[in-house]
């Protein structure tokens, strides 16, 4: 097994035993990126010089006996996290040359532990997309089948795990942007409860929905990485001040006697037969492990996609107003006057999907439509949140598909934005409810593409979903399969 194949906890043990140094592990990862990333396009920016300096520092820490779970581990970051001295583009032309003067909180926490940041990962522009095709830096490809998308918007973060060009990565999830690519690329992706991880230093798409989370090779790594980045941050007013439990300690508790709910609105006509088979096998597996399986109802699910695309686009229209060519980002060269500079800079800097969403959001917030769309969507969001709280009075965890189909072909849905939007139908409600969800590898389609299983927990119920995911992973071993790169 190569160094780049190892999980966080496996590499940690080797670093601790001094069987390998962080510099060796980092060099191995940088060589792997050079060897395969031209096929995958998971990275927008690779940072070999900074990474090797960080690796040398990690080796000094290890020699001094100061080793944390992430010390010396090569990590990739979605290019939505601001990184001091490292270009941060958010997948957009408008930020093509933006170099931030500070680190976001999640990045700072990784650096505190001595993690090594090897680069910034490809994504849909401003995290708006489900396929990584809206990136100004070209589409990222799925390592399991290079003609398919890796999912999105954290496509590069998932593809780097599958291609073994990062030991672990961080992404963000606004409507499924960690869980859906994790499912399509056969890795573990966790969206924590809203407020569990600081959003300070995350370029905003939809501020009431965005949440930072880990993408990893297995559930133990997910628990380790979440533990490293979670916690209260006074710099983020939506961060919640509750203690961070030891997520790893409770992994092996098992699922005997836990109540798992199957929302009937999620097991619908039109589910891909391979996805349905994987879900049926997962349900049977949990039954055999002693879980109590029962049907539950989330009656407002049918309104979730419409609700999301009003709230998210409205927030995006406000958040993206700051990109006007004045203080940072792309500025049009030949503008005559201020108004033309604003409009030309934005017209040149934003891609078509971002423009579409800004227009949708501006329309939903405009006078005469605000009550009919935005206010109504917020009311429906409250009903969706209540659906989840009602379901969690009866069960501990919900089990659902992640996506209606496995990964789709590049360009297959580009002509029909509505089809693309519907690919997040099973993940969006979790963001609207503000609770937590995890994607775990659950099998493969007939074409050999990965299929993920979603486990949804109560607000701040990350321990329960990690435990349930770990029990499933231990029995199935799907996570050990490797993409043929």
From Swiss-Prot:
Positions annotated as active site in the UniProt record: 78 (charge relay system), 153 (charge relay system), 177 (acyl-ester intermediate)
Any GO CC annotation of this UniProt entry: glutamyl-tRNA(Gln) amidotransferase complex
A Pfam family the protein falls into: Amidase
EC number: 6.3.5.7
Keywords noted in UniProt: ATP-binding, Ligase, Nucleotide-binding, Protein biosynthesis
InterPro entries given in the database record: Amidase (IPR000120), Amidase_CS (IPR020556), Amidase_dom (IPR023631), AS_sf (IPR036928), GatA (IPR004412)
Disulphide linkage map: none
GO molecular function: ATP binding; glutaminyl-tRNA synthase (glutamine-hydrolyzing) activity
Superkingdom classification of source: Bacteria
Residue ranges that the Swiss-Prot or TrEMBL entry lists as coiled coil: none
Catalyzed reaction equations: L-glutamyl-tRNA(Gln) + L-glutamine + ATP + H2O = L-glutaminyl-tRNA(Gln) + L-glutamate + ADP + phosphate + H(+)
GO biological process, one term: translation
Function summary: Allows the formation of correctly charged Gln-tRNA(Gln) through the transamidation of misacylated Glu-tRNA(Gln) in organisms which lack glutaminyl-tRNA synthetase. The reaction takes place in the presence of glutamine and ATP through an activated gamma-phospho-Glu-tRNA(Gln).
Quaternary structure, from the entry: Heterotrimer of A, B and C subunits.
Similarity-based family: Belongs to the amidase family. GatA subfamily.
Protein's recorded name: Glutamyl-tRNA(Gln) amidotransferase subunit A
């Amino acid at each position: 097994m190569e160094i780049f194949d190892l999980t966080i906890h496996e590499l940690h043990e080797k670093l601790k035993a001094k069987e390998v140094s962080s510099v060796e592990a980092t060099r191995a990862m940088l060589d792997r990126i050079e060897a395969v990333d031209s096929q995958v396009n998971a990275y927008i920016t690779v940072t070999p010089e900074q990474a090797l300096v960080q690796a040398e520092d990690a080796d000094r820490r290890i020699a001094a006996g100061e080793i944390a779970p992430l010390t010396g581990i090569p990590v990739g970051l979605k290019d939505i996290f601001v990184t001091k001295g490292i270009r941060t583009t958010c997948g957009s032309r408008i930020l093509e040359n933006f170099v931030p003067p500070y680190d976001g909180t999640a990045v700072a926490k990784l650096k505190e532990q001595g993690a090594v940041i090897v680069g910034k990962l490809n994504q849909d522009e401003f995290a708006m997309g489900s396929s990584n095709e809206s990136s100004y830096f070209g589409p990222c490809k799925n390592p399991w089948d290079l003609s398919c998308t890796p999912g999105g918007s954290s496509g590069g973060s998932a593809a780097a795990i599958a291609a073994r060009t990062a030991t672990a990565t961080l992404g963000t999830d606004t409507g499924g942007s960690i869980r859906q690519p994790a499912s399509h690329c056969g890795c573990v992706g966790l969206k924590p409860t809203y407020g569990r991880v600081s959003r300070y230093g995350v370029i905003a798409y939809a501020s009431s929905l965005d949440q930072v989370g880990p993408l990893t090779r297995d559930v133990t790594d997910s628990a380790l990485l979440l533990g490293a980045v979670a916690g209260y941050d006074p710099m983020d007013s939506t961060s919640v001040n509750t203690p961070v439990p030891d997520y790893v300690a409770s992994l092996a508790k098992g699922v005997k006697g836990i109540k798992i709910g199957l929302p009937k609105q999620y097991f619908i006509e039109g589910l891909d037969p391979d996805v349905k088979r994987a879900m049926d096998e997962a349900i049977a597996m949990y039954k055999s492990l002693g879980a109590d399986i029962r049907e539950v109802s989330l009656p407002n699910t049918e309104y979730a996609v419409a609700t999301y695309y009003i709230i998210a686009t409205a927030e995006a229209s406000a958040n993206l107003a700051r990109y006007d060519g004045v203080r940072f980002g792309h500025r049009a060269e030949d503008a005559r006057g201020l108004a033309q500079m604003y409009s030309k800079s934005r017209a040149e800097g934003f891609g078509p999907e971002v423009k579409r969403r800004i227009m949708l959001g501006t329309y939903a917030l405009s006078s005469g439509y605000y009550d009919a769309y935005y206010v109504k969507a917020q009311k429906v969001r409250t009903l969706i949140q209540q659906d989840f709280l009602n379901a969690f009075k009866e069960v501990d965890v919900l089990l659902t598909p992640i996506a209606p189909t496995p990964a789709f072909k590049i360009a297959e849905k580009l002509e029909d934005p509505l089809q693309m939007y519907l690919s997040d139908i099973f993940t969006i409600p979790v963001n609207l409810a503000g609770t937590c969800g995890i994607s775990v590898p659950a099998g493969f389609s007939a074409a050999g593409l990965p299929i993920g299983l979603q486990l949804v927990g109560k607000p701040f119920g990350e321990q329960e979903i990690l435990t349930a995911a770990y029990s499933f992973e231990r029995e199935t071993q799907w996570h050990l399969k490797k993409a043929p790169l």
